[in-house]
Regions:
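Non-transmembrane, aqueous-exposed alpha-helical and coiled segments at domain scale
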Residues: 2-125
């Protein structure tokens, strides 16, 4: 006899990406990493942050990691706007990797910044 596990396991990032098909697993992992780092930079205690604050944290992380190639990397993963960050956040909320406050909406991620401006135009060649 074998014991059956009653608890349902969370889907991993690869499973979420395969099911949704808009974003790569790397995109989902990046947003998750960015949330953790953004919260740590703001406070020592875990707390809620806004969609705009998360987008700014993700922008900084992308520039730190990839510099002038940040837009290319993000676009390759399916992320083309700050709204896409929100789409990933809400996918992760749906799959219990993140949580949201009652006041949070997808609109919090609309047009926080323009990718061309912050990832491409700021670098002079």
């Amino acid at each position: 006899m074998q014991a059956r596990h009653i608890l349902k396991m969370k889907k991993n990032f690869e499973q979420i990406a395969k099911e949704d098909a808009r974003f790569s697993p790397s995109a989902i992992r990046f947003v998750y990493e960015g949330l953790s780092l953004t919260v740590k930079k703001i406070t020592v205690e875990p707390r809620h942050i806004s969609g705009q604050t998360l987008c700014e944290g993700l922008r900084k992380l992308a520039v730190e990691k990839w510099g002038r190639m940040a837009m290319v990397v993000l676009n390759n993963w399916g992320i083309k706007t700050t709204r896409d960050f929100g789409e990933i956040v809400y996918l992760m909320i749906k799959h219990k990797w993140m949580s949201a406050a009652e006041t949070d909406t997808m609109d919090d991620f609309n047009d926080v910044f323009d990718f061309q401006t912050v990832f491409k135009d700021r670098f002079e060649f």
